Amino acid sequence: MARIGDGGDLLKCSFCGKSQKQVKKLIAGPGVYICDECIDLCNEIIEEELAETSEVRWEELPKPREIYEFLESYVVGQEAAKKALSVAVYNHYKRVQAGENGGAQGREDAIELAKSNILLLGPTGSGKTLLAQTLARMLNVPFAIADATALTEAGYVGEDVENILLKLIQAADYDVKKAETGIIYIDEIDKVARKSENPSITRDVSGEGVQQALLKILEGTTASVPPQGGRKHPHQEFIQIDTTNVLFIVGGAFAGLEKIIEGRAGAKGIGFGAQIRSKREIESKDQFEQVMPEDLVKFGMIPEFIGRLPVITSVHNLDREALLQILVEPRNALVKQYERLFELDGVELDFERGALEAIADQAILRQTGARGLRAIMEEVLQGVMYEVPSRKDVARVVITADVVLSNVNPTLIPRDSRGRGPGEQKTA
């Protein structure tokens, strides 16, 4: 029996005016009522608005030249890699845009655009991770980094490949719609190469098994992701995420691959008439610029995995000049960062040219590339960063080559008797 209001009429929804008999449920509030149909409509409106705010604004998708110029302001050198990434990323999100617009306005003969994941080859400290991070920052999409060495095949001790997707969902604040257009960078992929070129009869759970497990999410599938990660909570509800529009950038150092490339290209030279190239001549070029898919298969990557990474590009070792540029030129250059740290204490920090050259030389000796520059800077500045904040008499710190090479103390320039530094102007 329907409830009757104070006026003798059936209760009605305050929003659509339908009576209690016309709807499944009527929820009462202080002086108002809302039906289940209006609640569903409100939910749809909210979901649409959230989807609009979470999606990339595709009409503003930057062109390849604009992407390249943005990368140029953060990453020194690696021109070929920056161009290849700019084109690949533009084409990927153009493909996503075409899919959201209904595939060429719903034409029956619409061409389905294939996914173009990226394989990025190059030595450690050459900028692979920074390139991927910078792309995600420019496009304002969620970004996650995963280490392939921590992954194992499902059912074994280690991380499942689905945990990579969980990191992306977390980066998107659990907005699955937004995560589905994000970028995932998988590092150290060369460490999951199988032990030999021939398929193994024994189970390789951290090598070939990981490559097999990655195939589906690279290609595009609806994956079930445990919200708490791992297998410790078997009864948890899974998050469904479609990886069709997730861009995967896969990177690795691939040490030893250059020998496989040289062997295929006949770099060693056999016979009287063969052209023999010197080691210096080979090293002067990008060691990975001639890579072919069969070289990667011989290295230990399975053909199906390489087939899902159609864009292959490389970064090269950074020379002394490139390391010097990295120290001072990019928007977030290391020297600028440390100058800002000292500025917050009211102290100027000056690096002489010789000091910067010595830091670059140390990074080359350690074979750590750009990643090693910060560690060297920390070693050089640790003592003065400990001392200077407690002293009010220091106006400027000068770092010379001897500070870097011989571990001598930096030059501390004091303020004058009125507390001014050497570069400060007198006030009237």
Curated annotation (Swiss-Prot):
Q: Which SUPFAM superfamilies match?
A: Glucocorticoid receptor-like (DNA-binding domain), P-loop containing nucleoside triphosphate hydrolases
Segments passing through the bilayer: none
Q: Which family does it belong to?
A: Belongs to the ClpX chaperone family.
Describe the function of this protein: ATP-dependent specificity component of the Clp protease. It directs the protease to specific substrates. Can perform chaperone functions in the absence of ClpP.
Claim: Oxidoreductase is one of the keywords in the record = no
Q: What is this protein called?
A: ATP-dependent Clp protease ATP-binding subunit ClpX
Q: Which Gene3D superfamilies does the record associate with it?
A: 1.10.8.60, ClpX chaperone, C4-type zinc finger domain, P-loop containing nucleotide triphosphate hydrolases
Q: Which gene encodes it?
A: clpX
Species this chain originates from:
Streptomyces coelicolor (strain ATCC BAA-471 / A3(2) / M145)
Q: Which Gene Ontology terms of cellular component type are present?
A: HslUV protease complex
Q: Which keywords does this Swiss-Prot/TrEMBL entry list?
A: ATP-binding, Chaperone, Metal-binding, Nucleotide-binding, Zinc
An example molecular function term from Gene Ontology annotations:
unfolded protein binding
Biological processes annotated in GO: cell division; proteolysis involved in protein catabolic process
List each copy of the ClpX-type ZB domain by range: 1-54
- Identify the InterPro entries for this entry: AAA+_ATPase (IPR003593), ATP-dep_Clp_protease_ClpX (IPR050052), ATPase_AAA_core (IPR003959), Clp_ATPase_C (IPR019489), Clp_protease_ATP-bd_su_ClpX (IPR004487), ClpX_bact (IPR046425), P-loop_NTPase (IPR027417), Znf_CppX_C4 (IPR010603)
